[in-house]
């Protein structure tokens, strides 16, 4: 059974959209999802339903600036001006605490994909005690510290000139360009995301997967990766 609910974000303003998938029988284990950049948790519905058939309770939230965890269209790809990365991590922890109260006696696992895997790695450092296991999927290798610093500096400069809600094609290309280069000639802007052409076409045509991150979100993401 699939249900939706909201809970207050750590940013103090946003209601975090959440989906839970419940198995029909006894819950054998819990899996909490942490989705990637420029997507949303309902994209994992087919996967979650499969796990439900195996006895898993699956739950996940849309991160700040994603899916239905926004107050307006201008908030897509925006976290929080000062504490964005910490707020996203805090929301993951809030959901885990709520879920553990429902199912305190079963194994608890977390899965993070792409940006969500980076968040999960940070989460484990801060709140990992008690987790039964974690799946780090589509994650990044060790990042160049100089490049991260340059990325942060560029975002700060652009924020001074344009504001933290500014969407920079330059920063976006710096982050995603290397992935695209390996898939030429490219049929879409996101050939690197999946080899399943049907899923790829659904992805690129989905307005909730088509926005550009603000310099705020990129800056906060770079800060998190540095941790």
Which functions belong to the PLM regions below?
Residues 31, 35-39, 114-115:
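Active-site glycine-rich loops that stabilize anionic/oxyanionic intermediates
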Residues 41-75:
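Conserved alpha/beta-hydrolase
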Residues 103-114:
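Alpha/beta-hydrolase fold nucleophile elbow
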Residues 1-25:
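N-terminal cap/lid segment of alpha/beta-hydrolase-fold proteins
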Residues 112-122:
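Glycine-rich nucleophile elbow surrounding the catalytic serine of serine-hydrolase chemistry
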Residues 213-227:
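Active-site nucleophile elbow and catalytic-triad environment of alpha/beta-hydrolase enzymes
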Residues 80-100:
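Alpha/beta-hydrolase active-site loop
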Residues 122-208:
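Alpha/beta-hydrolase-fold enzymes
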């Amino acid at each position: 059974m699939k249900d939706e609910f909201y809970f207050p974000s750590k940013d103090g303003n946003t209601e975090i959209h959440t989906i839970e998938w419940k198995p029909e029988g006894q819950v054998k284990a819990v899996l909490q999802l942490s989705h990637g950049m420029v997507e949303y948790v309902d994209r994992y519905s087919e996967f979650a339903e499969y796990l439900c058939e195996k006895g898993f309770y699956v739950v996940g939230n849309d991160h700040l600036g994603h899916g239905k965890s926004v107050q307006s269209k201008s908030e897509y790809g925006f976290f929080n001006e000062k504490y964005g990365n910490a707020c996203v991590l805090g929301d993951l922890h809030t959901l885990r605490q709520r879920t553990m109260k429902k199912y305190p006696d079963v194994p608890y696992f977390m899965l993070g994909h792409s940006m969500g895997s980076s968040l999960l790695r940070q989460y484990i450092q801060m709140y990992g005690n008690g987790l039964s296991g974690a799946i780090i999927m589509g994650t990044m290798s060790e990042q160049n510290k100089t490049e991260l610093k340059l990325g942060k500096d560029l975002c700060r400069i652009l924020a001074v000139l344009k504001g933290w809600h500014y969407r920079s094609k330059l920063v976006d290309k710096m982050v995603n360009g290397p992935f695209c280069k390996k898939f030429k000639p490219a049929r879409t802007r996101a050939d690197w995301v999946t080899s399943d052409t049907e899923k790829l076409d659904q992805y690129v045509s989905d307005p909730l997967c088509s926005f550009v991150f603000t310099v705020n979100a990129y800056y906060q993401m770079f800060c998190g990766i540095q941790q």
